[in-house]
Every structure is written in C-alpha cells, then in structure tokens.
C-alpha cells in the first residue's frame, strides 16, 4: 500500500523534521526499491495506491508494475477492501516504508498462512509492517483500531475474532528522523 509519492502527501511526520522534498525523495526511492526487491515468481507484487486517480498516472510507475486503487475509507477499510479483492488467495499487505523487508520475510509470511488465518509482522512503534490473511474475513476486522499509535497491532489482533495467527520478526518502519537514524545505526553494525 502506498500514497501518491508527492511532497505534502507522504511521510508528513518525517517531512516536519527534514523537509517535504527530502521526505518525498526518500519515500519514492524506498518504494521503488521495495517493489524491485520483492519481485519474485512465487507471488504477485501489486501496488495499491491512494488516491485512486494515481493508478492512471503511469509516468511514475513502470508499465510492468500492476497497480490497483485502495478505494474509500480509513486505513482499515482500505486493507479490508484489498483482502476482499484477493479473497481466493493468501494475501499479504505491506507498506512502502520498511527498508529491511526481504523476499525471505515475505516467503515466511506465506508459509505461516499455510496453517493460520492471519500473520502479522510487528513494527517497532506498536504497529505492523505486514499483515497477511487467507480465508473468510472476520466481520469486524480492523474496526475500532487506533491507527498510528502504540496500540495499533494489539487493537488489530483483537479484531481477528479468535482466528489463529502467527507473528514474524519485528521490523522498523520509517516515520521520523529518529527512525532513519536508528535504521542507519543498525545497518552500520
């Protein structure tokens, strides 16, 4: 899932610290890198975009990248829409701001979906960098989740309605300059 990578529309918390141009450049670079690095014959990489009109703006995207609109609603409603669209297949949703995501981590997520209805990849900030699902969706999936908070992951798990889930290793997403600096420190050691 990604927002239109234009100044003022992405990484707004990071932009307050480093400026809108730098934050947007970082996001564009990271998003393209993620798409390139996760391309694999074992799964389809599909970019779900917001606003929906951005799907038609092909100048940013390579023609071989499959893009779909996110649709209306809050983040939970948009993710629910994606899971419904791919209801007949195990599906994983990630954001474009997770630098250390790898094919191995995605492969593990799909393997875990072989025995569970959900898989989550917890983020350092209390959210998640990946959520995967297979089968019928719980009726109240994502309802009442406090987005962009330390409770996002725990609130989300509560909406699974006791369906079994697995967890992946914790990763850092990038929302602030401190996140970027922490990431740089981790990769230099």
Predicted segment positions?
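A short, N-terminal amphipathic alpha-helix
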Residues: 25-43
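N-terminal nucleotide-binding beta1-loop-alpha1 segment
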Residues: 1-13
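Short aromatic-hydrophobic micro-motifs that form the base-stacking/packing surface
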Residues: 92-94
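Short phosphate-binding loop-to-helix
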Residues: 57-90, 149
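Acidic donor-binding segment of Leloir-type glycosyltransferases
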Residues: 42-66
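Conserved donor-nucleotide/metal-binding helix-loop-beta segment in metal-dependent transferases, i.e.
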Residues: 99-127
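Conserved alpha/beta core of the MobA/IspD/sugar-nucleotide pyrophosphorylase nucleotidyltransferase superfamily
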Residues: 154-189
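Short, glycine-/small-residue-rich phosphate/pyrophosphate-handling segment
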Residues: 134-157
């Amino acid at each position: 899932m990604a927002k239109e990578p234009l100044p003022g529309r992405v990484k707004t918390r990071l932009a307050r610290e480093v400026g809108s141009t730098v934050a947007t450049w970082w996001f564009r670079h990271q998003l393209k890198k993620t798409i390139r690095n996760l391309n694999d014959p074992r799964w389809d990489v599909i970019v779900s975009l917001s606003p929906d009109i951005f799907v038609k703006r092909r100048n940013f995207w390579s023609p071989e990248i499959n893009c779909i609109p996110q649709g209306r609603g809050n983040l939970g409603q948009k993710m629910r829409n994606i899971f419904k669209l791919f209801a007949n297949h195990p599906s994983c949703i990630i954001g474009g701001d997770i630098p250390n995501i790898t094919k191995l981590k995605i492969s593990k997520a799909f393997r875990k979906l072989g025995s569970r209805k959900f898989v989550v990849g917890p983020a350092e900030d209390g959210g998640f960098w990946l959520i995967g699902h297979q089968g019928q969706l719980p009726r109240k999936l994502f309802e009442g989740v406090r987005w962009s908070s330390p409770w996002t992951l725990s609130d989300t798990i509560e909406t699974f309605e006791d369906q079994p889930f697995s967890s992946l290793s914790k990763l850092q997403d990038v929302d602030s300059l401190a996140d970027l600096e922490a990431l740089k420190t981790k990769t230099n050691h």
